[in-house]
C-alpha cells in the first residue's frame, strides 16, 4: 500500500506487520509498505528474534530470512500472486488461490493504483483489507458486490478497517478459517 496524508505516515504499515509477525504470520510486502517496514527494521533476519512469534521465529532462523519479505515495487504485487500460485501448485494446499490461508492489505492506500492492485487480488480470490473504504459507499449494490458478492464468484472480497490491530485480527481470522478448511491446523510432529 501507499502512504496517505490522512494518517500518520508508515504507522499503519508497521503496526499491521508487527501484529501479524507477532502472531506467526510471514509477511510479504511491496512498495511503500515494504519501505515503511524496512525503516522500522523489520526486513532483517534479526527482527525475527525480537518481534516474531515462536513458530515464525523458528522458521526464519532455520532459513535465514526476515519475518517481512520485500517483493519489489508497488507494481510488483503480481510476484506475490505468483508465489501463491506456486504454493498452490507445489504444496497441494487446495484447488484455487482462494483456498490458501493468505490475505492482502493496504492500510494507508491513497491512489487508484492501489485500488487496481486490490481488485487484482480480489479477482484472483484473495481477501483484502483496506485502511479506509473505496469510494463506493454511495451505492449499496457496488458495496455489497465488492464486500461479499465477489466472494461467491472469485473467492475474494474487500473489507475496510482503519485500525491496524483490528485489521490484523480480521486477517488472522480469515487465515485460521482457511487453515481449518485445509485441515492444516492439526498439531503434528515437528520437522525442524
Where are these regions (language model features)?
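Anaerobic metallocofactor- and corrinoid-dependent redox/one-carbon enzyme cores
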Residues: 1-192
Amino acid at each position: 500500500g501507499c502512504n496517505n496524508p490522512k494518517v500518520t505516515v508508515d504507522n499503519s504499515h508497521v503496526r499491521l506487520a508487527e501484529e501479524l509477525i507477532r502472531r506467526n504470520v510471514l509477511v510479504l510486502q511491496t512498495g511503500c509498505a515494504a519501505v515503511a517496514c524496512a525503516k522500522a527494521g523489520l526486513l532483517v533476519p534479526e527482527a525475527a528474534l525480537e518481534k516474531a512469534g515462536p513458530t515464525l521465529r523458528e522458521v526464519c532462523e532455520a532459513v535465514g530470512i526476515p519475518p517481512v519479505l520485500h517483493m519489489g515495487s508497488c507494481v510488483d504485487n503480481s510476484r506475490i500472486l505468483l508465489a501463491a500460485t506456486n504454493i498452490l501448485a507445489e504444496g497441494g494446499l487446495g484447488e484455487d488461490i482462494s483456498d490458501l490461508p493468505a490475505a492482502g492489505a493496504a492500510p494507508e492506500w491513497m491512489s487508484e493504483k492501489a485500488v487496481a492492485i486490490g481488485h487484482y487480488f480480489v479477482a484472483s480470490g484473495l481477501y483484502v483489507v483496506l485502511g479506509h473504504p473505496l469510494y463506493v459507499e454511495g451505492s449499496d449494490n457496488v458495496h455489497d458486490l465488492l464486500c461479499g458478492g465477489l466472494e461467491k464468484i472469485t473467492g475474494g472480497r474487500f473489507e475496510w478497517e482503519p485500525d491496524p490491530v483490528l485489521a490484523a485480527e480480521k486477517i488472522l481470522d480469515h487465515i485460521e478459517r482457511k487453515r481449518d478448511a485445509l485441515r492444516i491446523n492439526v498439531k503434528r510432529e515437528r520437522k525442524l
